[in-house]
């Protein structure tokens, strides 16, 4: 069984629509979507949810990626994008659950025609990335 977290965003919605895998459980923090569980990892506990379904892998699309939403609600964006993402990833590693984590492109400054190197430090547009 695979858990797909964050299916209310663009990439998660696309993934859900076109995934050929049959054993997926989809979750969204914000809204109840068709074929989805509404599950907010910032409010609910991981362990009971994971025990119930015995997940073998997790695909994580969940984030607040809109720069204005992050700027206007710094506490929630830090909670979702950093604090609970770290807790979830630590939980997955501790329990040997394979995961794929998609991250925001907004970590980089966004200058056109510039090649970014992950090892270097940049000043990000996003408040929680600096």
Sequence positions of predicted segments:
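SDR active-site strand-loop-helix element
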Residues: 5, 27, 58-62, 99-105
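N-terminal Rossmann NAD(P)H-binding glycine-rich loop of SDR-like oxidoreductase domains
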Residues: 1-21
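Short, polar loop motifs at secondary-structure junctions
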Residues: 7-10, 25-33
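Catalytic helix-loop patch of NAD(P)-dependent Rossmann-fold dehydrogenases
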Residues: 79, 83-84, 107-130
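Catalytic phosphate/metal-binding cores of nucleic-acid and nucleotide-processing enzymes, i.e., regions
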Residues: 14, 18, 29-32, 76-78, ...
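Rossmann-fold cofactor-recognition segment
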Residues: 29-45
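NAD(P)-cofactor binding segment of oxidoreductase domains
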Residues: 72-100
